[in-house]
Amino acid sequence: YFAHFKEQEKGLPKLMIGTKWQDSQPETEIMAAKLKLKSILAWPDNENDIPSWKKKWSKAFSVGHKEVIKTSSRLAKALASYAVLIKQKIPEIYSIETDDGVIHKLHESFKDALIKDLGISDFADMIAQTIAYGLFSARTTGKEISGIETLAESIPSTNQFLRDFFSGLESLSGDGPSDLDFDDFSLYGLIEMLNEAKIGAILEEFGTQFNGGKQDPVIHFYETFLSEYDKQRRVERGVFYTPKSVVDVIVSSVHQSLIQDFNLPLGLADHSTHIVDGKAWPKVMILDPSTGTGTFLEATIELIHKTMVNHWKSEGVKKSEILDLWNNYVDNHLLNRLYGFEVMMAPYSIAHLKLGMKLQQTGYKFNSNIRLNVYLTNTLEKPAPISNWVPEFISIESSKANEAKEQIPFSIVLGNPPYSKSMTMNQWITELMKPYKQNLDEKKSDINREEWKFLRFATNLVSESEIGIVSFVINNSFLSAPTLRRLRSKLLDDFSLQIYNLHGDSNIKEKTDEGKPDANV
């Protein structure tokens, strides 16, 4: 696509927009690009504000003329621009389809098996992120994407859902009136952009740390994507980055508690078993119910790896033997104890990518049968039977998530739940929240916020376990809000509490001892 201004005999220059047609680019993609350019390249109200209109005009193109994407930041922005096009297209197709149309069927399948209250807008968002990050995941293998037909094979085996998703889409595609047309989603343009990107340099960037080790580049990539793609969604879902220092405190506190309070010398690395309902389970089963991009699970892997290496060294194991022992440990004693739930598609995909990279950095070699136990699911929804008509690639993911919710005796629940107004209201979570609401007569209450639902989910999950630890970064209002008094009372009845106040609460305008604004977490 290209644009230029044509001088007029009278008045302002005229904006001329043209396209370079390619067989692989459908008319819908061309029209979307024209609309985007027309809105961004409008003549400025203030011609003298040169920096302002230059900045606005530069947004018209995800990359410059003949520019190849070499950085994660530029790639995130380009990926977001395609995701926006896909997200806009899905409701258009939905509105003209019959109930038997592919988009209608997919929507109903996701509602039945994954997220019960999934509206068409949120569904479009999920599919857009799935496609964008699915293709990105395929490209991270280092190989170019040869085409839609072989896309599923290109996605890392650690993310079986994405592999099955694209296999399922391929089976639904075709030229018939009720088939799925990949041209409608600008996939060929997205594939071309990803293939031309310097993926090696970008992955090397992922292996480093920004700002003197203070910022994770994978998180930076995701936050750049989300800010370009949908800022409001980030606020609604309470998606915010947890500083690594805070993550490390949470994970290490759980580790130390297992050692000191539960007499497990290896802490989070312990894989001894006990009998639960007649079956042997590891005592330390770990869940992050709001996984996001996998930061807490990544820190857990780091700590467990360090613990086991030190343990083997203390036993006199030769350095040359430790790598084999670690690979065996991951296969048999780590992956089966590490779980995550995530409801948003982009962070779900990044979590798989990030955890896979972390394990590879420790020297672990994935075999083709291994997948990570991070599942796409709404933590706050009760598991329900899955209809027989739901496509297999969706039903498998949902079945695995339901199995984890219902059958696995989790003893450790950690993470940073979303801070947002109530997004999930169903009979199951409403019933579960009742102990937090007893004898509350306030007309206004924040007790239905998402973070308190996640806290209730977590405490309920571990309450029957021989070992039970919940370690969350939680809203500061927990300490003093009157409407949370029953919540605090319930926790005091059931748990031994340890509270680390990270300070820096802007809502109450905390000050330092010197009287300055507290800039802590």
List PLM regions with ranges:
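A generic structural motif
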Residues: F2-H4, T28-L35, Y364-N373, Q498-D505
